């Protein structure tokens, strides 16, 4: 919590951490994203990979950023947690934030994205509306074929 929120005046002032505010933030994020803990205030290293992933995503979304760049947001989490994370990303975008999601999970891409761009061989294909692109199109673009061949 602390490194991400070091500039938050409610959490840190003059180099000192407000431990009560930090603990309250951690509890709020854990509750919102159903991060179950074996003890009340565990260190991050005590959380499983999936629990840590949910917590990190929750921590970032808690600040309601205007821009969020997220890589593999549902990696390592169960299906229920993945649905919660995806819905939170959709809600953030619906509130006007720009969300750039990098994912290898096509189901996730089709569930969350408005537009899809594919990187192949170091080149970025033009972004296309998700409604105008198929899994086959994405596969062809991933193979490095020209965009018109994927249409």
Question: What is each stretch, according to the model?
Answer:
Residues 1-151:
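Glycine-rich phosphate-binding loops of nucleotide-dependent enzymes
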